[in-house]
Amino acid sequence: MWRRLIYHPEINYALRQTLVLCLPVAVGLLIGQLHLGLLFSLVPACCNIAGLDTPHKRFFKRLIIGASLFAGCSLVTQLLLAESIPLPLILTGLTLVLGVTAEISPLHARLLPASLIAAIFTLSLAGYMPVWEPLLIYALGTLWYGVFNWFWFWLWREQPLRESLSLLYRELADYCEAKYSLLTQHIDPEKALPPLLIRQQKAVDLITQCYQQMHMLSAHNNNDYKRLLRAFQEAMDLQEHISVSLHQPEEVQKLVERSHAEEVIRWNAQTVAARLRVLADDILYHRLPTRFSMEKQIGALEKIANQHPENPVGQFCYWHFSRIARVLRTQRPLYARDLMADKQRRLPLLPALKNYMSLKSPALRNAGRISVMMSIASLMGSALHLPKPYWILMTVLFVTQNGYGATRVRILHRSVGTLVGLVIAGVTLHLHIPESITLAVMLVLTLASYLIIRKNYGWATVGFTVTAVYTIQLLTLNGEQFIVPRLIDTLIGCLIAFGGMVWLWPQWQSGLLRKNAHDALEADQEAIRLILSNDPQATPLAYQRMRVNQAHNTLFNSLNQAMQEPGFNIHYLSDMKLWVTHSQFIVEHINAMTTLAREHTMLTPDLAQRYLESCEIAIQRCQQRLEYDRPGGSGDVNILESPDMPSHGLLSTLEQHLQRIIGHLNTMHTISSMAWRQRPHHGIWLSKRLRDTKS
C-alpha cells in the first residue's frame, strides 16, 4: 500500500513541489522572519518554469546558469529602473538578449520565460529592500531548489524515467486492446482508424520522451539504468509488433465468418493488454515481474492459422502475437541494439547567436512576439496608473504556450481559475483566520493544487490564487485590496497573450502541414531503401523505423493543432486528414516489413530493385504535388509513372505490403491534387515552392 502511495506520480510530484516551497516558509516562521521565508518560496516558481528540476547529466551546471540569469536579470532591472529607463525598453532588451537560448536547445529555451519572471518578481521588490538582497534571494533560492531536488531524485532513484516507462506500457496496453476490439469494423477505416491514430500518437510521444530522458541522463552508459533501458527496448519491440496491420478487411471478414478467429484474436489482445498493465505497475512501484505465459492463447491462434492456410490474416496474427508473447515471457528484447543517437539540436553559443541574427529564425520571432506583448502589458499598466504592473506581465508569460490551441486552453483555465480563487479568498479574508491556521490552509492548498495540476490546470490555479492572496495578506496586511485589481490584471494579461499568439508572427500548424508531410515521405523512402537493400542490418532498421513513426507523429500533431486554428479551410484540412490516414497505413506496413527484413525475409535482387523503383517514383510524385505551389506547377500530366508490377503467382507477405504501400501513395497523390484547390492563400502559403518555407 505504501508503495502505491509514495511512488504514485502525482503524489510524488506534489510532495516534492510542496516541500521545496514550504520548508523555507517553515524555517522563516521558526526564526521569526516569515516574510523572508515567503519571499524565498518565490524562487522555485522561476526554477520550475526553467525546467531546472529535470534530471540531467549536467544538473548542477544548469543550476548555476539558471541562478546567474535570475540574479543578472534582477540586477539589470533594478539598475535600469534607478536610471529611469522605461519598463517596456527594459523588458524588450532582456527578451531579445535572452531569446538566443531557444537556438541552443529546447531545454535552454525555457530559461527565457523563467528569467523574465525573475525580473518581474524584482519589480515588486525594488524599492523595498537593498539592491543586493533580491540577488541573494535568487542565488540561495536556486541553490536550495537544486540541492533539494538532487536529494529527492537520489532518494527516489530512477523515478522520473520509471513514470514515463509505466505510462508507455499502459498506452501500449490501451492501444492493443482498442485495435483488436475494432476487428470487425476495419471495413470502414475512416471510423475505425482515428481513435487508433490518437493512441498511436500518444505511444510515439512517450517513446520520444523516454529517448530524451535517457539521453539527458546518459542512461546507456550508466549501469544503474540497465534494467530500465532493457524495459524500454522491450517496449519498442512491443510497439513494433502491435502497430502492424495487413489492411485486408475482406480477408478478415472471411476468416471471422468461417471460424471463431475474432474471439481468439481478441482473447490474445486482452491477455497482452492485461500483462502490459501489470508490467506498468511493476516498473512504477519497483517490483520484480512475475512469471508469465500465454501458450493457450497462442496455441488457439496457431490452430486457426493451420486450419485456414489460404487466409493470410491467421498467419499474420499468429506470427506477430507469438513475438509479443516471447517478449512478455522472457522479459528481454527480441534482438540486441544500442540506444538510437540523440537527434535533438544543441548548438554552442556562437553558432546559435549567428542563427539567431537571421530574420527567419523562429527563436527571434518568438522573442520579438514576447517583447511586444511585454511592452503592451507595461504600457497598459501605465494607462491604469500601475507603477509596477507585475501581475499583468506574469499572466502573459504564464499563459503563453508554444501553439495557438495550447495558449487558448491555458487562457481559459487561468482566467476562470483566478476568478474562482479570488472569490474564495475574498470571502475567507472576512473570517479573520489566525496566522497559524492560515499557514496550514496554504500548505494543504499547495499540496492539493500540485496533485491535480498535471490533469486540471484550472482547478490548480484556484488553489494557487488563494495562496497568493494569503501571501500578500501575510506580507502587507492588504489582501482585500489585492483582489479586484488582480482580477482585472489577469483578464488584461490573457487578452494580450491571445492577441499576441494570433497577430504577432503566428506559426500556424496548418502552414507546416506540407513540410511535415514532405518529411514523412522522405523518412518512408529511406526506410524502404533499407528494407530492400542487399543486407539489411537490425540496428539501422530499428532506428529508421522509429524515425518513420516520429515523422508521421509530427505530421499528425500538426494536423490536430491545425484543426483547432481559426481562419482555415475546413474542407482542405478534412482532405489532409484523409491523406494522413493513408500515411498511417504506410507506417504500419513499414513496421511489419521491418520485422520481416530483420528475420531475413527478402526478395530476389531484381525484384527488390523493381519494387524500390516503383516505391520511389510513387513517393516522388507525392512530393512533387506537395512542393509546387501553383496548380499545374508540377505538370498536369504525371511526369513520373509507376512501372508495371510483376505478376507472378502468389505474392509473398513482403510483396503484399509493398503493393499496398504503392496503392496508398497513389491515393495520397490523388487526394493532395484535389485538396490543393482549397488550400489557404495567405501567410506561409504564399511561398511558391516548399523549399522556400524550409529555413
Task: Walk through the language-model features, giving the residues of each.
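Structural signature of hydrophobic alpha-helical transmembrane segments
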Residues: 27-42, 76-93, 134-140, 380, ...
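Membrane-interface helix caps and helix-loop-helix hairpins in membrane proteins
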Residues: 55-56, 77-84, 103-104, 125-135, ...
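Core alpha-helical transmembrane segments of integral membrane proteins
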Residues: 31-32, 346-444, 466
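Alpha-helical membrane-inserting segments
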Residues: 23-31, 47-48, 72-80, 97-102, ...
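Hydrophobic alpha-helical transmembrane segments
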Residues: 11, 15-19, 60-68, 88-93, ...
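Generic detector of multi-pass transmembrane helix bundles and their immediately adjacent loops
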Residues: 430-571, 577-580
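Long, hydrophobic alpha-helical segments that serve as membrane-spanning/inserting helices
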Residues: 1-15, 22, 26, 30, ...
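Helix-loop-helix transmembrane hairpins and adjacent membrane-interface loops
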Residues: 2-14, 19-132, 146, 150
